[in-house]
Amino acid sequence: MILALFCIFLVSAFFAIFEDKLSSFKWVIYALVGVCLVLLAGFRPVGIDNDSINYELYFFKYDNPLFENTVEPSFRFISGFLYKNFKDVHSIFIVYALFGVSLKLIAFRKLTQHTYLALSIYICTYYILHELTQIRIGISSGLLLLAIVEICNERRKNACGLFLIALLFHYSSIMLFPILFMSNKDFSFKEKYFWSGLVIAGYGFYFLHIGLATLPIPYIADKLQTYEELKQEGFIDEVNVFNIVFLVKIVIFYYIMYFYDIIKKQNNYLSLMMKMESISLFSFTALSTLPVLSFRVSELFGIVEIILYTNILYTIRPNLFGKIISLTIGFILMFIAIYYNKLIQL
């Protein structure tokens, strides 16, 4: 499994380095890499990741009333159809991988000129997290990337429609709707400081022990309090706000913000993406007392990292060196995800 993933990454990285010199034939390879990613996620052994055992349970018990409030209707409906026809959990892995991977590959072509570089970063980061683990949110994150294009081109109704579809696949997608009111206008001097300061403010919430569970909001406060109790009883892991991956993300965020004026000439969606990344980093620390919410918000908004990390090449000359640095960062993050965070069982 890991060897296959590494080989696909090497193929993508090779084409990323020489993408500028390739003909239209590169899109055939691009599609074939996508097919390989779908098959790898679709036929992975149950138990090799952290969530597939639960998905197998949801699949075979799709009509169990206990799951009505915790599993989205779309997952139960698709599971019911596939169970009756195939009775194999891999069928739903394939369906979700097909949508999750395809949506992202389409989005990469819209969001960046360096599609293979984005593909390589994706393989190293969110492919492992979403298509191999959190398959429901994998579709939502793909729809989010497509919605960025719609929002930045003032087609907010289209973006709203995409968010509504995303909500069918994962309830946490409800957090995406505030993005509809965000602007993609160039940052002013004050705005740069605000969005940069928001990341630091997250640590302020962490050190001051400010928790959302104390907010007097009916139902939500009760739900958050339940998460807090589960954490105290040891059923939910603590959030390490000083883990190496998160610190690297912060460094890259400030690096890109420093070179904002250079990068924005190449990335028409930079302002909105940086706002989303700032929210992602802020949420991870500010919501750390509620690990489930902390990870959900941070990982969903953080999908823009795939494009942002490719933007590093615009700040380095020659571009080849910039691509190598971006690929190296991606490979290191993949190594940490597999061997340190153990997102894939060896």
Predicted features along the sequence, with ranges:
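Membrane-interface alpha helices of multi-pass inner-membrane proteins
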Residues: 127, 158-182
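Short acidic/glycine- and proline-prone juxtamembrane loop motifs at membrane-interface regions
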Residues: 132-138
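Membrane-interface transmembrane helices that cradle and orient dolichyl/undecaprenyl
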Residues: 144-158
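Signature aromatic-anchored transmembrane alpha helix within multi-pass, membrane-resident enzymes
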Residues: 196-200, 318-337
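Alpha-helical transmembrane segments and terminal signal-anchor/GPI-anchor hydrophobic tails
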Residues: 53-57, 62, 72, 76, ...
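Membrane-interfacial loop-to-transmembrane alpha-helix junctions, especially the N-terminal start
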Residues: 26-30, 266-277, 321-326
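TM-lumen/periplasm interface segments of multi-pass membrane proteins
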Residues: 16-97, 336-346
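Transmembrane-helix signature of polytopic, membrane-embedded enzymes
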Residues: 105-125
